[in-house]
Amino acid sequence: MTFKRVHLIVMDSVGIGEAPDAEKFGDAGSHTLKHTLEGFEGKLPNLEKLGLGNIAPLPVVNKVDKPEAYYTKLSEASVGKDTMTGHWEIMGLNIDQPFKVYPDGFPEELVTAIEEMTGRKVVANKPASGTAIIDEWGAHQMETGDLIVYTSADPVLQIAAHEEIIPLEELYEICEKVREYTKDPKYLIGRIIARPYVGEPGNFTRTSNRHDYALKPFGRTVMNELQDAGRDVIAIGKINDIYDGEGVTKSIRTKDNMDGMDKLLEVVKSDFDGLSFLNLVDFDALYGHRRDKEGYMNAIKAFDDRLGELLEALREDDLLIITADHGNDPTMPGTDHTREYVPLLMYSKQFDSGRELESHTTFASIGATIADNFGVELPEFGKSYLEELK
């Protein structure tokens, strides 16, 4: 069975249990979905009927006799647990050199280089929450024009500045310069992120003018193959940034998860031939890193509420794929991602019923299935499930 269109949703960080090598990453016992849903008193009827509860025992999501989707869990072959590594593997790359994280801030030589190339002083230079760092340094930045440089548990370098002090175009230009400089392999920083904010001391707000400057993928992805074959590749949310535009034919920005679902529904109702690819980042950015279990739980419920609308809007020859890129268990110590299996659900109105697919294959099985469906070159690793979808 083949499909005219494939819609791929990455529920960012919604892992489904510790990976076989979780202990090496300090993540033994992690289980984002299970731990997030413990104590939840609502229901998730759409994820349940697709078969999410058939993948692993979960609170409130029951196992069903006739799941509507094909389902399994996938493990990551690459040596990281960050967003870029997970997404790049989904599209067929095996990342064997991990991106670097900077738990003690960036090296002095890099800070000096940023100051010299921008003519502005760097302050902060430490891991921090984006909202906390502007609360701490925002007023200082307004007075001095310094750059608030910070990182997180991810391999990112973020630069925050007030929009009225450093205009957006200048902030973007600064980030482009830093991106170019940090392409040196000794840094291995996945993304440089512009983080503009507005407001007054005590009431700062980050704006939607964030921009990510990623490294280009380390090889060709399934998205490149689709683009070369004349197919549409519609990137929704931060997908375009994650792949640095490689293989993307159209990019649609989003404000949050619900706006992402709105934009996906618009795409589903439009005419195109190929892949739509949505990342829902709020699970990770707003709730996982902040260890906000209740917020995470409510975000999953909000997604399930919208999922019913999406299922109804799908065309007969559409395939919907729902997965994740890593875990971020809000009950674990620290603020970092967790090394976990990710769920895989594949649904089409053409299916009489779903069933379990072979488990323990890699994230690249998703890209392989998409490539197989559209008749383009398959990635070097990853198992296509296309023949099993009937």
Curated annotation (Swiss-Prot):
GO cellular component: cytosol
Cofactor note (record): Binds 2 manganese ions.
Enzyme class: isomerase
Compartments, record wording: Cytoplasm
Necessary cofactors: Mn(2+)
Pfam families to which the protein is assigned, alphabetical: Metalloenzyme
Catalytic activity: 2-deoxy-alpha-D-ribose 1-phosphate = 2-deoxy-D-ribose 5-phosphate; alpha-D-ribose 1-phosphate = D-ribose 5-phosphate
UniProt xrefs under HAMAP family: Phosphopentomut
Family: Belongs to the phosphopentomutase family.
NCBIfam families: deoB, PRK05362.1
Protein's name according to its UniProt entry: Phosphopentomutase
Species in which this protein is naturally found: Macrococcus caseolyticus (strain JCSC5402) (Macrococcoides caseolyticum)
